[in-house]
């Protein structure tokens, strides 16, 4: 990144759970603080000062001339509303994925950001992980025959985090980033609420008609894990080796956001990123529709 801006961008962090706390920590990073000035945080709870960061009301954050940027780090169900409010107030927005729980809402938010001339950045730290870098290298130049990605974890509240195709959109983003735009073939949902168990099974297809399956399985006792199986004409990949610790991935995401604020990301790159994000959200909406139709 080039020289410091004449005035730092004032930032508020909305939501101080795990992601919000990491964002507050990274905003204090010496490199980032050359460009960003942490003004305060917004929370529904009355918490007072946190790590010498003052709590401010949502109304003050929206109204303040000091605030240029909002980081939205709340549960997914509230992302759309917060993004809309801050864009309407003329603020730039960084939001944890997914930005919204429907494709239509995401389209509206992008249009609003364009109307207001503001940066709308959806975080995708999964694309900054060492595992993804390894997969990108393994996939490059090879002809895909078929593949599958299965994710297991403990139960997640759908009311807060959305339908599994949305709460699991980072896995879908991996598949799209590795294999290009995908077509939806089928989607089914097994749901046993009394056992807190769910399994979503999605069949997708690449533009070259190679099949990909994506499974999200959540229930008590299931460990957080990704199971990958990719078959090429030249061989297969059945697991991702331990490729090292994912260091500072939120900070790397913040650096990308700063580059956008400074106008250092090309229009072509911005358009490609927006296209990928909307493609994934459209697939997620279609998957949800198919699963609900079959229940």
Swiss-Prot record:
One of its GO terms (cellular component) is cytosol. NAD(+) binds at residues 18-19, 76-79, 97, 167. It catalyses: (4Z,15Z)-bilirubin IXalpha + NAD(+) = biliverdin IXalpha + NADH + H(+); (4Z,15Z)-bilirubin IXalpha + NADP(+) = biliverdin IXalpha + NADPH + H(+). The keyword Thylakoid does not apply. Binds 1 zinc ion per subunit. GO terms for biological process: chemotaxis; complement component C5a signaling pathway; fatty acid metabolic process; gene expression; heme catabolic process; inflammatory response; lipid oxidation; pigment metabolic process. This is Biliverdin reductase A.
């Amino acid at each position: 990144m080039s020289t410091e801006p004449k005035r730092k961008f004032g930032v508020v962090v909305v939501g101080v759970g795990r992601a919000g706390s990491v964002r507050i920590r990274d905003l204090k990073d010496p490199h980032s603080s050359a460009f960003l000035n942490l003004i305060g945080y917004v929370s529904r709870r009355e918490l007072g000062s946190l790590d010498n960061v003052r709590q401010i009301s949502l109304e003050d954050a929206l109204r303040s001339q000091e605030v240029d940027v909002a980081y939205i780090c709340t549960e997914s169900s509230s992302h759309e509303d917060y993004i809309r409010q801050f864009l309407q107030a003329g603020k730039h927005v960084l939001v944890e994925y997914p930005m919204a729980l429907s494709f239509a809402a995401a389209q509206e938010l992008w249009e609003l950001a364009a109307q207001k001339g503001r940066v709308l950045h959806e975080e995708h730290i999964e694309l900054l992980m060492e595992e993804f870098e390894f997969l990108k290298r393994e996939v490059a130049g090879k002809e895909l025959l078929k593949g599958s990605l299965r994710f297991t974890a403990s139960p997640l509240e759908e009311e807060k985090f959305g339908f599994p195709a949305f709460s699991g959109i980072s896995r879908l983003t991996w598949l799209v980033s590795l294999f290009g735009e995908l077509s939806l073939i089928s989607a089914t949902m097994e749901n046993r609420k009394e056992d807190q168990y769910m399994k979503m099974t999605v069949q997708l297809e690449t533009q070259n008609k190679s099949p990909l399956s994506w499974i999200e399985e959540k229930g008590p006792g299931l460990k957080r894990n990704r199971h990958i199986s990719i078959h090429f004409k030249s061989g297969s990949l059945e697991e991702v080796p331990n490729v090292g610790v994912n260091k500072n991935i939120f900070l790397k995401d913040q650096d990308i956001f700063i580059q956008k604020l400074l106008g250092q990301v090309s229009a072509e790159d911005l358009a490609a990123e927006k296209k990928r994000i909307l493609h994934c959200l459209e697939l997620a909406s279609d998957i949800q529709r198919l699963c609900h139709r079959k229940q």
